[in-house]
Regions:
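Positively charged n-region of N-terminal signal peptides that target proteins for export
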Residues: 1-6
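Bacterial N-terminal signal peptides
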Residues: 9-16
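Bacterial Sec-dependent N-terminal signal peptides
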Residues: 16-37
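Active-site-surrounding "flap" and adjacent substrate/cofactor-binding loops of secreted or lumenal enzymes
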Residues: 36-38, 54-57, 62-120
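N-terminal post-signal-peptidase region of extra-cytosolic proteins
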Residues: 40-46
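Hydrophobic/aromatic-rich, well-ordered segments within soluble, folded domains that form packed cores
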Residues: 49-69, 208, 554, 561-566
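Noncatalytic, helix-rich "gating/capping" subdomain that lines the substrate-entry/channel surface
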Residues: 93-358
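Zinc-dependent metallohydrolase catalytic domains
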Residues: 145, 353-490, 494-655
């Protein structure tokens, strides 16, 4: 893709090279057998498979080898990453285009209807009036007050105010500037002298470098697939917090008419605010200009727009998707509503909800059978599982007061600015809410229903499954049930459910409060199993001679392993009535579907750049490193040797 949007930035691609598994550290080693013979049978996925590869050597290559050959990277368009999540993003983009073109969302339709090159002068005048306000600020105090006014207008200056959920209650939260796209050339096009343009961009670059250096958890995970936007958040008392002698949060609260005495944020974000207060007047002015111009440049009528609904409609893609996914855009909830109504059958939500309840029952059954936990800890685990909330697709009830309204504006740019204003008003109305609907809307406020994301929030003991997961390629009603249980079930629902009990989620109780509910011995047993899983992944290479970091990816690996075990048990119990060979065939198709769900190809360079710090293992390892820990995979595919073989007593089982 030439332009990255939140839903497409999936740092969980795969690659067309062989996964290397180091058996040197496995003292048991594979048996002497060297049969290396695959089971010969038809599969729904035959066109993607490479049967010249033994499933026990590289299950990922066995399943997807032909597809990888047929879909090389880089593509002719220069794409470094292709695959399932990119397809999901493209499907969502096309749906948004159709919804807009058909007038099914009046705000989006009006935005395009108003777009006119003749508006450039008046729009530029409005934008530059804000720059003039900055120039006229005579003191640091006046500049800080002006920045508070800009936050009220929806500018990330330096952050936006958004609804944040903590222990199932909506608090005011903050989110630092998400995307830095401004260049000096763009600034000059708006009539700002070249020297000042360079200084503005340099100020933005300096701030961006500082934010990155703080390594805020929320900032790091913002562009990840299946990221929890609430991670690292805590309730911070700001009533007496002064930064460099300035109570700017207090000033901001008065300006917004919002109680900011307690903010749901992480300490890194608050320290960034403290740092900003050390800026002098001139530095604040340059940075504020960056924040204003960086947001608004893309909404000025600077080029012709192609408003066709074809996939190649670049203008429509950019303008509507920017307005729908931009930080603090009021269009997000409105377009999310339209997307769920017009792009997703209502029955999909009911079916995904039923799948969740089946998997919850399967997980509960598994907990009861664990021999490494005492009954006391099992009871606590079941209590947490039973209390886990599941927010699927869209809220049960629609709330007009939490969605943007169409207002009369003369130009598209002015309407966009109004939508940002509305976002702040909606946030204000949500503070203090505790209903399930409010919690779901709060998540929509930060990403939109059309974003490819699902996440577990330990602070709320809840799973949010955004609506884009309820359509192909994640949930495909044209496919047999084994596909949907392996992809939506194992890789999404079961994965997120298990996050509630991974190395981090296990530290929170049923209501989202941090609490150690483990007996000392059970906690030790749990940590021992985690160590085994770390060791297992430390031996896996996703690029030749480049090993996975088992500790860094531990939480995701626990969730992957639990997800496939829970989904498989649920599928076999609830959907498979056949017996004997036919039953085993359907079970094998489940495992093949699991690999299909991680169908990606990426360049080696892209893999090296993204997986060095990613908490997710590379998808080739999320397949090979997971299936070879499940006993059923060995039985079903008749695996008794091969590079992936792990001796029975070395196969890690946690959840």
């Amino acid at each position: 893709m030439k332009k990255n949007y939140l839903w497409m930035l999936a740092l969980c691609g795969a690659m067309a090279f062989t996964s290397c598994i180091d058996n040197a550290d496995n003292p048991s080693g594979p048996p002497e057998s060297t049969s290396h013979k695959n089971i010969e049978e038809a599969s729904v996925f035959s066109k993607d498979m490479d049967l010249s590869v033994y499933a026990g050597d590289n299950f990922y290559q066995y399943m997807l080898g032909q597809w990888l050959k047929d879909n090389p990277v880089p593509t002719k368009d220069g794409d470094l990453l292709i695959g399932a999540i990119i397809t999901q993003k493209q499907n969502a983009t096309k749906a948004l285009a159709e919804i807009t073109a058909k007038g099914q969302n009046l705000i989006a339709f009006t935005l395009l209807s108003l777009y006119d090159h003749d508006d450039l002068q008046s729009d530029s005048t409005l934008l530059m009036s804000k720059i003039k306000q900055i120039d006229e600020a005579g003191t640091k105090e006046a500049m800080l007050q002006l920045m508070a006014e800009f936050v009220k207008q929806g500018y990330p200056c330096p952050f936006v105010i958004l609804p944040e959920v903590l222990m199932r209650k909506v608090y005011p939260g903050i989110e630092m500037l998400r995307e830095y796209n401004l260049t000096s050339l763009k600034v000059e096009r708006m009539g700002i002298p070249d020297k000042e343009a360079i200084s503005i961009v340099e100020a933005g670059d300096k701030w961006q470098a500082y934010v990155k250096s703080k390594a805020s958890k929320k900032q790091e995970k913002m562009l990840s697939y299946h990221y929890n936007p609430h991670e690292g958040v805590m309730l911070i008392n700001t009533a007496r917090r002064r930064s460099a002698g300035t109570d700017w949060i207090g000033t901001l609260g008065k300006t917004l008419d919002m109680d900011l005495s307690a903010i749901a944020a992480d300490e890194d974000e608050m320290s960034m605010v403290d740092h900003l207060m050390t800026y002098n007047l001139d530095s604040l002015k340059l940075l504020a200009k960056y924040f204003i111009l960086n947001r608004d440049y893309k909404y000025l009528p600077l080029k012709e727009l192609d408003i066709n609904t074809d996939e190649g409609s670049e203008g429509l893609f950019e303008y509507i998707c920017d307005a729908a996914t931009d930080q603090s855009s009021g269009l997000a909830t409105s377009l999310s509503h339209s997307y769920t109504q017009h792009a997703i059958p209502e029955s999909n939500k009911a079916e995904a909800t039923a799948m969740f309840e089946e998997m919850r029952a399967a997980f509960r059954n598994r907990i009861g059978k664990y021999d490494w936990m005492t009954d006391v800890t099992k009871a606590k685990a079941m209590e947490k599982l039973d209390a886990m909330k599941y927010y699927c697709g869209w809220p049960d009830n629609w709330h007009a007061e939490w969605e943007a309204k169409l207002v009369a504006e003369e130009t598209s740019y002015r309407l966009v600015c109004n939508l940002f204003n509305q976002y702040v008003d909606i946030t204000r109305s949500m503070i203090g809410q505790t209903s399930d609907d409010a919690i779901f809307y709060a998540d929509w406020m930060s990403m939109g229903a059309y974003v490819a994301n699902a996440f577990y929030s330990p602070e709320n003991n809840s799973i949010a499954l955004l609506a884009s997961n309820l359509v192909s390629p994640i949930y495909d009603k044209t496919m047999p049930s084994y596909y949907n249980y392996a992809v939506l079930g194992a890789q999404t629902i079961g994965h997120e459910m298990t996050h509630g009990f991974d190395n981090m989620g296990s530290k929170y109780n049923a209501i989202g409060k941090k609490e150690n509910w483990w007996t000392p011995q059970d906690e030790q047993n749990f940590e021992s199993r985690q160590k085994l899983l770390i060791d297992h992944f430390n031996k896996l290479q996703y690029v030749p001679d480049v090993y996975c970091d088992g500790k860094q990816t531990l939480g995701e690996n626990i969730a992957d392993l639990g997800g496939i075990e829970i989904a498989y048990e649920s599928y076999m119990k609830n959907k498979v009535t056949a017996s004997g060979g036919e039953r085993d065939y359907l079970a094998r198709e489940f495992y093949r579907s699991f690999a299909e769900g991680w169908k990606f190809n990426m360049t080696t360079e892209y893999a090296l750049e993204n997986f060095k710090t990613d908490e997710h293992a590379a998808p080739i390892l999320r397949v090979n490193g997971i299936v070879n820990l499940t006993n059923e995979w060995y039985r079903l595919f008749n695996i008794s040797d091969g590079a992936m073989y792990v001796a029975p007593d070395k196969r890690v089982s946690i959840w």
